[in-house]
Amino acid sequence: MHIEIEPTTVDQVADLRFLYARELDDVIRYEREIRQGRTRIYGVWNGGALIGYGILHGEGEDRNTVVEFFLLPQYRWHTVPVFDHFTKVTEAAGVQARTNDTGLVLLLYERTRDIVPGNFYFRDAENTPQRTPGLRCRAITPDDLDVLTPIMTTSEGWPFELPDRGALATWIESNEGRLLEDDEGIAGIGAILHGYNAPFASIGMVVMKRARRRGYGAYLIEEVKRETYAMGKIPRADCAPWNAASRATLLRSGFLVNARALRGTLSAQS
């Protein structure tokens, strides 16, 4: 084999990424960042033929963590040496993989150290009707801008926190936001995040502090799930390892843990 690793574009590896998505059968975590040009993409060529690709992401400008790596099946006997060449050329420093991304997680165990767990990833398993009278769930509209600004531009709006009113107005126009209301006003905010690989959408929610421990979160998740399916998409979700409350809410809403994120530091190559 004569392997070459060269920068490329997301369009040039689109067919390979389609095969990768079919094998993963899950939402691709960094799909939005990839489409926004916030990653580094490299093709893997053998004698001029494109046989695979890899993508690196990271915090800030340090895009040195491998988050996708794929080779066509007939070349996978050579996965480890090709990966070693890939990480050397790209000056990769680490690997991040989900436990259901079999190819990359095996490379993570084979070639990294100091492995630490990260987010939990969930798939929907069942419908769990939530009986919580007096709640209303609806789409967020431009008329909600004033009332949402003091929430969504502060830490209370996390994980949907936005930097300013203008960014919030843009987000509202995307039609991703959902509002949960009770007799006292805004009780929670949900989201159906588009822009991921078909047929998946990532969903999320936050419940206002005054409305917590009432079952509102599970109700909101079920409503957002129902609407996601009505759009012809399959809902997926994730949460941080420290967020036990959100994890419990997702489980109560019919989700099951589908995978766990792992991150490791690449060992020095001789």
Task: Indicate residue ranges for each PLM-predicted region.
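Short amphipathic alpha-helix that is part of the acyltransferase structural core
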Residues: 1-27, 127-161
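Conserved active-site tyrosine of GNAT-family acetyltransferases
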Residues: 107-109, 250, 255
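Glycine/small-residue-rich hydrophobic helix-like segments
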Residues: 176-234
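Conserved acetyl-CoA-binding loop-helix of GNAT-fold acetyltransferases
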Residues: 75-88, 213-228, 247-252
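Conserved GNAT acetyl-CoA-binding A-motif
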Residues: 90-101, 228-240
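Conserved donor-binding loop and adjoining core beta-sheet/short helix segment
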Residues: 28-90, 187-202, 206-209
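Active-site rim helix/loop that mediates acceptor-substrate recognition in acyltransferases
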Residues: 21-41, 157-179
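Acyl-donor-binding surface of acyltransferase catalytic domains
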Residues: 58-63, 70-135, 264-266
